[in-house]
Amino acid sequence: MHLARVTGAVVSTQKSPSLIGKKLLLVRRVSADGELPASPTSGDEVAVDSVGAGVGELVLLSGGSSARHVFSGPNEAIDLAVVGIVDTLSC
């Protein structure tokens, strides 16, 4: 799992049937202290939200087959999922 900050939302009218009705979020991975890096090593990514996260929140990401299993099964077109909202973080 990884920590990320929700930076926006994605609207897609044409998508795989397995994504219909699912909320898509734009997320950027953050450092261990929850801060966006000064010069990000990677750009924003799209993740499917499973917990009702909003813009600006610190979240937990799950990727690959684990992300698909958060939803209904292994045939979902999902590679990255928001699986938790972080309340506190101590380093």
Curated annotation (Swiss-Prot):
More info: Bacterial microcompartments (BMC) 100-200 nm in cross section are formed during aerobic growth on minimal 1,2-PD-B12 or anaerobic growth on 1,2-PD-tetrathionate medium, but not during aerobic growth on glucose, anerobic growth on glucose or pyruvate-tetrathionate. BMCs can constitute up to 10% of total cell protein.
Pathway per the UniProt entry: Polyol metabolism; 1,2-propanediol degradation
Name of the featured protein: Bacterial microcompartment shell vertex protein PduN
InterPro entries: EutN_CcmL (IPR004992), EutN_CcmL_sf (IPR036677)
Gene: pduN
Superkingdom classification of source: Bacteria
Location of the BMV domain: 1-87
Biotechnology: Artificial BMCs can be made in E.coli by expressing pduA-pduB/B'-pduT-pduU-pduN-pduJ-pduK (in this order). Enzymes can be targeted to the BMC, and appear to be encapsulated within it.
GO BP, sorted A to Z: propanediol catabolic process
Protein location: Bacterial microcompartment
Subunit description: Homopentamer. Interacts with shell protein PduA.
Protein role: Probably forms vertices in the shell of the bacterial microcompartment (BMC) dedicated to 1,2-propanediol (1,2-PD) degradation. Required for structural integrity of BMCs and to mitigate propionaldehyde toxicity. The 1,2-PD-specific bacterial microcompartment (BMC) concentrates low levels of 1,2-PD catabolic enzymes, concentrates volatile reaction intermediates thus enhancing pathway flux and keeps the level of toxic, mutagenic propionaldehyde low.
Consequences of knocking out this gene: Forms BMCs with a variety of morphologies, including elongated, enlarged, and aggregated MCPs and some with rounded cross-sections. Grows in an interrupted manner on 1,2-PD and vitamin B12; grows for a while then stops, then restarts as if a toxic compound was accumulating and then decreases.
